[in-house]
C-alpha cells in the first residue's frame, strides 16, 4: 500500500518540476521581449530625431513654393492692365465710329476694370500707369459723350404739339433700338466718370448731356403754345366774362403732360434708380421755368381784369392741380414744382372772391347816371353772367372757399389771412353763401344808387323791379345757380328785394289811392250801408252837405288827373315783361277795390254827365288791366 502511494506522489512531484522548468523558460523569454522593446523604442527615438528636421524643412519649402506662385500670379495681374492699355488704346483713341459700338464699349469696360485693379494695389510704382489709364479712359469718355450728344441731336428737332393733340397721335419718342444704344453709352460714361473729376462737378455727365439736348428740344417745342396762351388771354371788355376753355393754357398744359409721359418712358430705360427722377427734373427744368413764367404773366393779366378773368384763374388751378397729380402718380416727380408754379394764381383766386364783392359794390356806387325810364344797367347782366360762369368751377372753388372759411370772403383782410378751420366744411354750401352774398351786394348797392339818382318813387320801384327780374331770370335759366340758391333761406333773402321794389313802386300810387278815401259818419242815416247790402249812391249824395259834395267832386277830379298821369308814366317806363305784369297786378289789387267802393258811393255826384266821374268801374278795370 505504501509503495503505490509513494509512486503517485513521485509522479506529481515530477510534473511540478516540469512546470517550474517551463516557468523559468517563460521568465527568460519575457526578459528577452522586454529587452527587444527597449531597443525598439530607442531606435524609434533615433529615427524620430533624424526625420523631424527633414519634415519641417519640407513644410517650409511648400509654403515658400506657394508664396512664389502667388507672387507670380500678382506679377501676372500687374502685367495684365499694362498689356490691356497697349491692347485697347488703339480702339479707344480711334473713337466709337471706327469700330462697332459693342466692341468700343467692351474696350472701355476692360480699361475701366484694369484701372480698378491697378488702383487696388496701392503701389507707388503704379501711379504713372494709373495716370495713363485715367487719361485713356477720359479720352474714351469724351468720345462717348460726343457720340451721345450726336445721337440725341438726331431726335431733337422741335415739333408742333398741336398737330399731335388735334389728331390724337402719340408724341414722338426715340426708337427702341436707339434707346438700347443710349442705355449702354450712358452706363459706360457714368462708370468712366466715376474715376475722373466729373463727379465733383455735379454728377453723371451723360445725364447732363441728355438733359441739355432733350431740355432744349422740349422748351423749343412748347414755345409757341406759351405764346398762344398769352395771346388768347387778351380780349375786349365787351366780350364779357372769360369763357371756359378759350385760353391756350389748357392745350399748353396738355402738351406739357404728354411730353413728360413720353420723356419719362425714355428716361426710365436709360437711367436707373435715383437718376431717373433727377434726369426728369433736370430735363424739364427749362420747360417748367417757361411754364411758370407763363402762369405768372397770365396771373398779372387776371389781376388787372379781375371781374371778368378771375374765372381763368379758377380754370388754371383746376388744370394744373389735376395734371400735377397725374404726373406724380406716373413718375413720382414734379408735383411740388407744379404746385409752386401755381401759387401766385391760387393767391389771386383766393383774393378774387372778396375783390368780386368789393368791385361789384364799387361799380354800382360809381354809376353816374341811371336810365330815366327805370331800365336796368349792364352791371346786373355782367354780375349774373359771372355768377353763372362761376358755378362751372366748383372743383377749384371748393378748396379755395374751404381754405377761406365761411363768410371770410367779405373782407380783403380775411382773404389773405388765416381763416378759422371748419372741421367739416361743405364746399357746396360755401359756394351758395358766396353767390348769395354777391347777389345781395349787387342789389343793395343798386338800390342805394337808385334812391340817390331817381327822384320819383315810380322810377325807383321800376328800376329795382327790373334789377330783381333780371337776377331772378338768370337764376331760373341756370340749373346750377338754381340748385345753389334753392334753399328756403336763400329764396327768402332774395325775395326781400322784390317786396321792397314793389312797395316802392306802390308808394307812387299811394297819393292817388288816398283820393278814394273818405270820412263816413255812422250816425247819419244811410251813411254806412249794412254789410253786403246794396249801396244807394243817390241817397248818399243827397245826404251830403254842399261842402262835402264839393269835397267829393274835388276828390274825383284829383283822382282822375293823378290816375291819368300815373298810367301814362307807367306806360312810358321801361319794364321787363315779367315786371310789367307783376306791377300792374299789384296796382290793380290796391286801386280797383278802393275805386269800386268810392264809385259805388259817390258816382251820382255828377248825374252821369262824366264831368267829375271820368271812369266807371268797368272802364277803370280795363285801364288797370291794360297796364300789364
UniProtKB/Swiss-Prot annotation:
Keyword flag Protein transport: yes
InterPro entries referenced in this protein's UniProt entry, alphabetically: Cullin_repeat-like_dom_sf, Exo70, Exo70_C
Example GO BP: protein transport
A Gene Ontology term for the protein's cellular component: exocyst
First-listed, main subcellular location of the protein, grouped into a coarse class: other
Record carries keyword Transport: yes
A Pfam family the protein falls into: Exo70_N
UniProt-annotated location(s): Bud; Bud neck
The entry's keywords: Exocytosis, Protein transport, Transport
Domain of life, per lineage: Eukaryota
GO molecular function: phosphatidylinositol-4,5-bisphosphate binding
Main function: Involved in the secretory pathway as part of the exocyst complex which tethers secretory vesicles to the sites of exocytosis. Also plays a role in the assembly of the exocyst.
Name of the protein this chain belongs to: Exocyst complex protein exo70
Gene source species: Aspergillus fumigatus (strain ATCC MYA-4609 / CBS 101355 / FGSC A1100 / Af293)
Gene: exo70
